[in-house]
Amino acid sequence: MSRNPFLDPTLQEILQVIKPTRADRDTRITVIDQLRDVLQSVECLRGATVQPFGSFVSNLFTRWGDLDISVDLFSGSSILFTGKKQKQTLLGHLLRALRASGLWYKLQFVIHARVPILKVVSGHQRISCDISIDNLDGLLKSRFLFWISEIDGRFRDLVLLVKEWAKAHNINDSKTGTFNSYSLSLLVIFHFQTCVPAILPPLRVIYPKSAVDDLTGVRKTAEESIAQVTAANIARFKSERAKSVNRSSLSELLVSFFAKFSDINVKAQEFGVCPFTGRWETISSNTTWLPKTYSLFVEDPFEQPVNAARSVSRRNLDRIAQVFQITSRRLVSECNRNSIIGILTGQHIQESLYRTISLPSQHHANGMHNVRNLHGQARPQNQQMQQNWSQSYNTPNPPHWPPLTQSRPQQNWTQNNPRNLQGQPPVQGQTWPVITQTQTQQKSPYKSGNRPLKNTSAGSSQNQGHIGKPSGHMNGVNSARPAYTNGVNSARPPSKIPSQGGQIWRPRHEQ
């Protein structure tokens, strides 16, 4: 395989644009706080907690990534089953409260989905949110992806690049019969498992069974047990991996990723992708996969035998394989920086990068780039698993800048309410960061969202994350047009768009 000398430095340029800034993180935390305020106005949801999950929690989101939010009804108590009908009813109440507040628009109730979801967009920040009820499974999977990303820093970079590439080629939308973002992350995990030498182990080495099955009994106890087992197994793998380290560059891993799945439409007829075992598995020999037929089977390692790629259609699978083939071939042959950008990114990224003059010092003849940790582990601020966030809920650190101490995944995930935390002794080890009101920002003195308008300059942090996007567009959707649900215009934007009020919590500087 010939090596493109400009690929590595160009990938770093792309990552610099798509990786979220601190302002992007703060903006999402502000949206979470605003949703908490609305939640308190819904009588049947008082006492429930707002818990983010998905790419924001796994630290695999881009600057314009959506927010996945779970409204947890039984935080910290026994794990109880919430029926689909009850979830639909509660989301209906929340929908009416969000509409009445005037701070949210493009409201859409996906009532008959496998997991009922309320889709909304925050009025000021223009962040899309998918809200569900008691999505403990999604939260658990997000934490596992975060733990995996801490094993090797190249994992996060490759996931971000693959997601941007997939969006650019219209193959990252489960609603249209292509990949969802979670299945793309699993493909990257599988790629890292099947490299030589392997970068990641089979996920059964990290957790020996379907983790979702262990979410029973007292939630705190169950989650702490999962975290402790995972921490010990990751530590063991990292110590053993030191004997054989894969030093492939990010560009080599990306090119081999596209090459590995370039015939996925052919392999999918006989084999399934199994990150749990870390190898291609014959579908006919796996009885748990047989009852249903899918165009592509990517087993969810944390909820077996669920197919994470069940949305991929046969017709689209052939097109997906063709996109893999073309991308693999062009990345090996193309030497032009702009053509690489055109292959891997969408228009809004291209417009930003094409305006950037590439300095000769950035693109050496040997293709190297002055970027630290190209082959190594996670970035310094992410080298260790997170501190005991739920025990120190007013700590100034945000979720993805953990201090350089401790090395275990979290314990005690479920202390979501600051009232339940005061006076508790510190717990050894670490817990998952629970974003609470006191962590994020102080309560705004303005009630009911009636905050004063404030002019926002084009270069302010509030506009970050919308690079190169025309006004009226958000995440590729024309937000200037109202959306209609069941014949009713539910997308009427507020006549006044409030600015962010109150004192916004800011993280301390990185070490």
Curated annotation (Swiss-Prot):
GO annotation (BP), single: miRNA catabolic process
Region (Disordered): 378-511
Alphabetized InterPro entries for the sequence: MTPAP-like_central (IPR054708), NT_sf (IPR043519)
Compositionally biased region (Polar residues): 404-465
Disruption-associated phenotype: No effect on miRNA accumulation in the wild-type background, but increased abundance of the heterogeneous miRNA species in a hen1 background. Reduced 3' uridylation of miRNAs without affecting the 3' truncation.
Molecular function, one GO term: nucleotidyltransferase activity
Subcellular location: Cytoplasm; Cytoplasm, P-body; Nucleus
Keyword field contains Lipoprotein: no
GO cellular component: cytoplasm; nucleus; P-body
UniProt EC number: 2.7.7.52
Low complexity bias spans: 381-392
Keyword Transferase appears in the UniProt entry: yes
Matching CDD domains: NT_PAP_TUTase
SUPFAM superfamilies referenced in this protein's UniProt entry, alphabetically: Nucleotidyltransferase, PAP/OAS1 substrate-binding domain
Keywords: Cytoplasm, Nucleus, Transferase
Reactions listed under catalytic activity: RNA(n) + UTP = RNA(n)-3'-uridine ribonucleotide + diphosphate
Main location group: cytoplasm
Enzyme class: transferase
Activity regulation (UniProt): Completely inhibited by 2'-O-methylation on the substrate RNA.
Family: Belongs to the DNA polymerase type-B-like family.
Function: Uridylates small RNAs to trigger their degradation. Catalyzes the uridylation of 5' fragments produced by AGO1-mediated cleavage of miRNA target RNAs. Acts synergistically with URT1 in unmethylated miRNA uridylation, leading to their degradation. URT1 and HESO1 prefer substrates with different 3' end nucleotides and act cooperatively to tail different forms of the same miRNAs. URT1 and HESO1 act sequentially, with URT1 mono-uridylating the miRNAs followed by their further uridylation by HESO1. URT1 and HESO1 are involved in the uridylation and clearance of RISC-generated 5' mRNA fragments.
Protein's UniProt name: Protein HESO1
Organism placement in taxonomy: Eukaryota, Viridiplantae, Streptophyta, Embryophyta, Tracheophyta
Encoding gene, per UniProt annotation: HESO1
